[in-house]
Amino acid sequence: MKQDLARIEQFLDALWLEKNLAENTLNAYRRDLSMMVEWLHHRGLTLATAQSDDLQALLAERLEGGYKATSSARLLSAVRRLFQYLYREKFREDDPSAHLASPKLPQRLPKDLSEAQVERLLQAPLIDQPLELRDKAMLEVLYATGLRVSELVGLTMSDISLRQGVVRVIGKGNKERLVPLGEEAVYWLETYLEHGRPWLLNGVSIDVLFPSQRAQQMTRQTFWHRIKHYAVLAGIDSEKLSPHVLRHAFATHLLNHGADLRVVQMLLGHSDLSTTQIYTHVATERLRQLHQQHHPRA
């Protein structure tokens, strides 16, 4: 079992070098694959002897045991990548994961806010306080750009150009993209940089654009708590909240106003158009409005 766990670490090291996966993804893979090794060990199996039927049984057992379909899909992805690696490195002469069946994932529509709700959320911070001025700027940037929360809290001073009105984002897979900020976000960034950030830094020299109260990089969890706080002030139902609520609103509202799907894909940093297409459910609302406005029998 120790040898198998060691091979998993070798695989994760190789995966990090080849794919530059996020630390959270690597840690999730480590947990999933360690669980798999333990499961195999209890059945007298190893990474060298496990067959396709064994791996399929593991996946089925996880699903029947209450594993979410998304968690099972992640486990399947980790298993496939591991055995592809073992086959490539000639540790095995076959790849038992090649024909594993994928668990069916329910298509969940992203939670989104109306434009009026977004406006209330953006107005919630008290801009006469440096901390809330920072939050105001963050919310404006988030809605203007559709960044992931992890991308937002990771921004540095060198990532923004207020003169050009763009932000440089290093997204998933270390892919870089430039996203327009818009006049409103630029205004609040300028205001924050003059009246908020110096107070938060209190003499500390760091390049982080949105530092915490301790002049450090803010965590995603901290910003999520801030969003929930302002949502309460704005009278927004918690059922509509998620860490990426403004990212979803960004995509939804762009499409509602006629933006091309591929443009939205580029702005969001999606590598696959199908990931962006889930937002097209909002087009129904836009079509209904157009129908009511222009059809003689509407």
Swiss-Prot record:
Subunit and partners: Forms a cyclic heterotetrameric complex composed of two molecules of XerC and two molecules of XerD, in which XerC interacts with XerD via its C-terminal region, XerD interacts with XerC via its C-terminal region and so on.
Catalytic center residues: R148, K172, H244, R247, H270, Y279
Name of the protein in its database record: Tyrosine recombinase XerD
Higher taxonomy: Bacteria, Pseudomonadati, Pseudomonadota, Gammaproteobacteria, Enterobacterales
Effect in UniProt of substituting H295E: Abolishes DNA recombination (in vitro)
Function: Site-specific tyrosine recombinase, which acts by catalyzing the cutting and rejoining of the recombining DNA molecules. Binds cooperatively to specific DNA consensus sequences that are separated from XerC binding sites by a short central region, forming the heterotetrameric XerC-XerD complex that recombines DNA substrates. The complex is essential to convert dimers of the bacterial chromosome into monomers to permit their segregation at cell division. It also contributes to the segregational stability of plasmids at ColE1 xer (or cer) and pSC101 (or psi) sites.
GO-annotated molecular function: DNA binding; site-specific recombinase activity; tyrosine-based site-specific recombinase activity
HAMAP family xrefs: Recomb_XerC_XerD, Recomb_XerD
Phenotype for R297E: Abolishes DNA recombination (in vitro)
Domain (Core-binding (CB)) ranges: 2-87
Xref: Pfam families: Phage_int_SAM_1, Phage_integrase
Regulation: During recombination, the heterotetrameric complex catalyzes two consecutive pairs of strand exchanges, implying that specific pairs of active sites are sequentially switched on and off in the recombinase tetramer to ensure that appropriate DNA strands will be exchanged at both reaction steps. FtsK plays a central role in this catalytic state switch that turns recombinase on and off reciprocally. The reciprocal C-terminal interaction between XerC and XerD may also participate in the enzymatic switch process.
UniProt effect for mutating H294 to Q/E: Abolishes DNA recombination (in vitro)
Residue ranges of domain Tyr recombinase in the record: 108-292
Subcellular location: Cytoplasm
Family: Belongs to the 'phage' integrase family. XerD subfamily.
GO cellular component: cytoplasm; Holliday junction resolvase complex
Gene Ontology BP terms: cell division; chromosome segregation; DNA recombination; DNA transposition; plasmid maintenance; resolution of DNA recombination intermediates; response to radiation
